[in-house]
Amino acid sequence: TAEKIGDKKLAQAFSGEDAVDINETQHFEKYDVTLMGIASGEDIAECVTEKNGEILNDRTYIVTAVSRTDGTPMPENAADEAYGDMRFFVSPLIQGCNPALVNVISMDGVYTEFIQDDVLYRLTECSNIEIFADRTVYLCVSDGDLYNEEAYNYDESTGEITRAEDYKGVNALFELPLDPALADPEAAEEYLAPLTGEEEEASDEDAYLLGSKEADAFMEKVTPDNIDQYAERIEDSVQTFGADE
C-alpha cells in the first residue's frame, strides 16, 4: 500500500521488524473489513504532514482494506450510484478516553486511499499511538465521515469501547497488538490534556484557587475596628433581629 502511493521509505518501514502484520477481517452484511498492519516511529515516511508550519514526524500508519461481501467491485467513479456509500471513518480509539473527543481527527490524522483489484485500501496516519500501549488501543472502521456514537458503546466507568451489536451498518472494532513496553504514561497524559478538556479544567481550577487565596488574604485584613475602611454601611439593607425573632 505504501509503495502504491509512492512512499518507498514507508514501505520499508512496513517491511521492517518493528511493523506489526495483523490481517484480521471482520464481516458485515455488505462489506468485509480487514486490518492489515501497523507501523509507528519517527521519520519513517517520505511524505510528511504539517500542522501550523511544524512537521509532524512521530506518527503511526495503519493500513486497512474494505471489500464488498458479494465480490462486486468497489466503485471508482463518482458517477456510480454506489460511490456515495463508500464513506468510511477509520480511527484509533484509546481506552479511558471518550472516543467522540479523542479520535483520528483530534489526533492530527490524515489518510490516502485507492482502489485496486476491486478492494478499497486506505493508509491512515495520526500521532504515534505507542505512548498508549499500556492501555487497550482499538481501531474502529465505520460507515460515515465522522465518529458515530450509535455504532459503538463507551463505558465511562471502565473506559472500555465495544461495538453496538444492534447497529445496522459497518462498525468494525479491532484491538491493536501494541507492545506495553513502548508506553509512556506521562507523555500520554500530556498529549491528552488539550483533547479531553483536562487542561482547560485545570486552568479553571487554578483560577478558582487563586481567587480563593486572594479572598482569604483580604478577609484576614478586615477586623471589627477597621471594617469601615473597606465597606460602606447601607442602611436599607440592615436588619435587626431580637431574641424573640
Question: How would you describe each model-predicted region?
Answer:
Residues 1-9:
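Single-pass transmembrane signal-anchor helices and their membrane-water interface zones
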